[in-house]
Structures are given as structure tokens and as C-alpha cells.
């Protein structure tokens, strides 16, 4: 049976959105590679936004240009940008594989089968959200290169919102868990193999979302600390506390809502733990530079975040295994039980 008109239109729109996402990925990838080389139009190295080793307070008071707050070191920034680029590549590969699978299995007797497959795999709205993620991330890196920390903080907040929306869309497609499970049962049999691929993609995006939560706290407070007069130690504590509050809120939402759609959601908690561990190294440099007596308190706060993340990992593992081993109980036959009562 030929595809319906609705399926044909949705498939073409979806294909155009995937092509746009692929072109945006190529643009962002070339940009992220070019920004690492000097004399290509970028004034500063984006990864040296807070290089404490390059600051010499005894000569020319170089710190007056920008207040150096708590931030991750250049190596961590480069690794973060590189991993995000690899995640973008993985998502593009996922969409291309899904598109190829749908095209190879669009001949079916079911009406609007292609539309149901596209909706469950990742529809046009998720593709354009993915484009917004890449564009806002590119804007964030550009702002760091130009030392516009306030603009960089704003761009990263927009990126984080888009990243969160994309994760929620990829998991739920903005429908109830019952409708999502029903749509999963109705997808084409040839697409069953992409379910595991989608689960891997979701967990990796959740992992980077957890690490990006830490990045959100330190980037936002870096912009605030360079926009208004505020003590550096207050900015440092605000960064960690923002990370803690946001991570707890996201973890509760995952355990209360999102696990009804995808059971093995461990990625965010792992990223949360990696963020706490990764931020501990800059704190040691921060202590050496400022000779701060507050570093112990900062480390304790990070330890609390790490313990909470481990607790959520254990909680998710226990709930996943218990749910997996749960079996249906045999229903009691009310008619036979009533007959037995009468005989007695």
C-alpha cells in the first residue's frame, strides 16, 4: 500500500529538517575547529577565559580587566567542547539512521504508519531544537573568545534551556506515558532495532546535561561576578549552590516523571557526579591563587553533590531492577470463590 498524503508530507518535512541539522552540524564543527587556531579572526583563546597561571598581580595589575572567579581550567573547557561536538555527531548519526530505516520501511498497509514512526523516533520539532542547541553553543564559545562573559552567560542559559527541552522532547515527545507506550507498540517492526540506539543517545545527552548543569552554575555566576560588585567567595559558593539546587530539581523530575518513559535513565546522575569531580580541580587552583580559607567549605559542598548523585544512581538502579523483576499476580476467580463459600 502506498503512503498516505499525510505520511508523504511529514516525511519530506522531516527529511528537510534533518538536512538542515546536518548542515548546521558541519558549520558548527568547522567553527569549533577554526576557533582553536590563532590569526583566524578570533581575538582570544576561548579556553583561557579564566587562566589563573597567566595572571600576574604584581605587574600592571592585570586583573582589572576581568575578575577571575571560580571556573574550570582550559583543559577541561577544551574537553567539554570536544565531547559536545562528538555528542552532536552521534545525534546526527541517530537521525540519519532513523531516516534511512523509515525510508526503507515506508511501504505498509497501516494508515499513517510513517507519521507514527517519525513521532516516536524524533520528529521535526526535536530536529529544530537540536539546531538551536548547536547555534547557541556556538554563540557561547564566540562570547568566551571575545571575553564577553555576561553575553556568554546569557548565551549558555539559552543553550541550557534548549538542551533541556530537547532531552524532554526526545524522551516524551510531549505526550503521556501511556500514549508513548502505545506509540512504541505501533512502530514498524523494522524500527525495533533503533530503540536501543535511542536509549543510548538519551543517556549520553542526559550525561552531558548533568555536566552542563555544573557548567551553568559557574558560567552564570562568572557573568554576574563580572557585572556587579560582589565578593569572589560569594560567587564561588553561589556557583556550587546553583549546581546543587538545579541538579536536585532535575533528578527529582527524572525519578518522578521521565522514568515512566525510559527506565534506564542513569546518564544525568553520572554527569552530575562527573561535574562535581571536575569542579574540584579548579577549586585547588583557586585556593592556590587567592590563598582562600574557604576552599574546605567548597570541597564539602561538592562532596555533598557527589554523594547525592551516587544516592540517585543507587535509587535508580534499585527501582529499575525491582520493576524488571516484578511479575503479575494471578487474579482471583470470584465465581469459583463464591461457589466454594456456598458449599461450605
UniProtKB/Swiss-Prot annotation:
Record's subcellular location: Virion membrane; Host Golgi apparatus, Host trans-Golgi network; Host endosome membrane; Host nucleus inner membrane
Keyword vocabulary terms for this entry: Disulfide bond, Glycoprotein, Host endosome, Host Golgi apparatus, Host membrane, Host nucleus, Membrane, Transmembrane, Transmembrane helix, Viral envelope protein, Virion
The UniProt record lists the keyword Membrane: yes
Keyword Lipid metabolism: no
Residues spanning the membrane: 13-33, 77-97, 126-146, 148-168, 204-224, 239-259, 264-284, 294-314
Virion surface side: 34-76, 147, 225-238, 285-293
InterPro entries per the UniProt record, alphabetical: Herpes_glycop_M
GO cellular component: host cell endosome membrane; host cell Golgi apparatus; host cell nuclear inner membrane; membrane; viral envelope; virion membrane
Annotated coiled-coil segments of the chain: none
Highest taxon of source: Viruses
Intravirion side: 1-12, 98-125, 169-203, 260-263, 315-344
Purpose of the protein: Envelope glycoprotein important for virion assembly and egress. Plays a role in the correct incorporation of gH-gL into virion membrane. Directs the glycoprotein N (gN) to the host trans-Golgi network.
Family the UniProt entry places it in: Belongs to the herpesviridae glycoprotein M family.
Assembly behavior: Interacts (via N-terminus) with gN (via N-terminus). The gM-gN heterodimer forms the gCII complex.
Name this protein carries in UniProt: Envelope glycoprotein M
Taxonomic source organism: Human herpesvirus 6A (strain Uganda-1102)
Organismal lineage: Viruses, Duplodnaviria, Heunggongvirae, Peploviricota, Herviviricetes
This protein's encoding gene: gM
Amino acid at each position: 500500500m502506498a503512503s498516505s498524503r499525510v505520511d508523504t508530507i511529514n516525511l519530506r518535512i522531516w527529511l528537510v529538517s534533518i538536512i538542515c541539522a546536518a548542515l548546521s552540524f558541519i558549520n558548527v564543527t568547522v567553527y569549533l575547529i577554526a576557533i582553536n587556531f590563532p590569526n583566524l579572526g578570533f581575538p582570544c583563546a576561548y579556553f583561557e577565559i579564566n587562566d589563573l597561571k597567566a595572571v600576574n598581580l604584581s605587574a600592571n595589575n592585570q586583573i582589572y580587566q576581568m575578575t577571575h572567579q571560580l571556573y574550570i581550567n582550559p583543559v577541561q573547557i577544551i574537553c567539554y567542547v570536544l565531547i559536545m561536538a562528538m555528542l552532536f555527531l552521534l545525534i546526527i548519526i541517530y537521525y540519519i539512521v532513523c531516516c534511512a530505516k523509515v525510508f526503507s520501511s515506508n511501504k505498509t498497509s497501516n494508515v499513517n504508519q510513517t507519521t507514527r514512526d517519525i513521532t516516536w523516533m524524533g520528529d521535526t520539532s526535536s530536529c529544530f531544537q537540536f539546531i538551536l542547541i548547536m547555534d547557541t553553543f556556538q554563540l557561547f564559545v564566540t562570547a568566551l573568545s571575545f571575553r564577553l562573559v555576561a553575553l556568554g552567560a546569557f548565551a549558555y542559559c539559552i543553550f541550557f534551556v534548549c538542551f533541556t527541552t530537547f532531552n524532554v522532547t526526545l524522551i516524551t515527545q510531549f505526550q503521556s506515558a501511556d500514549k508513548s507506550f502505545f506509540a512504541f507498540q505501533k512502530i514498524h517492526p523494522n524500527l525495533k532495532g533503533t530503540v536501543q540506539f535511542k536509549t543510548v543517545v538519551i543517556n549520553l545527552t542526559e550525561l552531558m546535561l548533568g555536566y552542563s548543569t555544573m557548567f551553568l552554575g559557574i558560567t552564570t555566576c562568572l557573568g554576574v561576578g563580572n557585572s556587579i560588585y560582589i565578593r569572589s567567595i560569594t560567587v564561588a559558593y553561589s556557583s556550587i549552590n546553583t549546581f546543587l539546587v538545579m541538579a536536585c530539581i532535575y533528578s527529582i523530575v527524572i525519578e518522578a516523571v521521565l522514568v515512566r518513559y525510559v527506565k534506564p535513565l542513569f546518564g544525568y546522575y553520572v554527569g552530575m557526579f562527573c561535574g562535581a569531580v571536575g569542579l574540584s580541580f579548579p577549586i585547588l587552583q583557586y585556593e592556590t591563587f587567592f590563598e582562600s580559607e574557604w576552599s574546605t567549605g567548597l570541597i564539602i559542598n561538592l562532596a555533598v553533590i557527589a554523594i547525592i548523585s551516587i544516592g540517585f544512581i543507587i535509587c535508580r538502579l534499585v527501582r529499575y531492577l525491582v520493576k524488571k523483576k516484578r511479575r503479575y499476580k494471578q487474579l482471583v476467580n470470584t465465581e469459583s470463590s463464591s461457589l466454594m463459600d456456598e458449599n461450605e
